[in-house]
Amino acid sequence: MFAMLSALLSSQLLTDEKSLDSIEGIDQDLLLLITRMFSTITGAFSTIISILFIFILSLIVTKIFKTEPRVKSLFSGSISLVLIINIVTLIVVIIQFLFGLNPEKYNILSLNIFNPGNEILGAFDFKLIIQSYLFMLLLHATGKLSIKYAAIISIVLFIFLLTLNLIGALI
């Protein structure tokens, strides 16, 4: 739900009504509604995919290290991790919505705030740090891994996610 709300607010800020004039035969209001609905549905699906990715990743890591966590606990922890990240995202989107900051130009959770529009700085996102830390807690508390191994895996996850963000910024 939080992902859907943040996607809806983001689409509210990102949708440029002038760019929607270019499609003939479709009413502008209908096109705007379709765009917002598509953004909301995409936000919901991305949340489900994130939960499954974190769950499968934590399950694989715990199987590699031969710990015996409860699968329900890992799934619950994965849901909690994604929920916390989505709440942070929703709060940031609400703040940006209230102050009229364009999410394409500014991201107040990244280094992009110092140089608006710079996508490479936008790749260095505070949510990555939060997500990696929460993944470490998930592996340690629920996955029954030692804090040392959980921290190492969390750092590897952080580097992987940062690399994906940088590749996405460069493309």
Features from the language model and the residues they span:
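Selected alpha-helical membrane-embedding segments in polytopic membrane proteins
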Residues: 1-89
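Hydrophobic core of alpha-helical transmembrane segments in multi-pass integral membrane proteins
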Residues: 1-7, 155-164
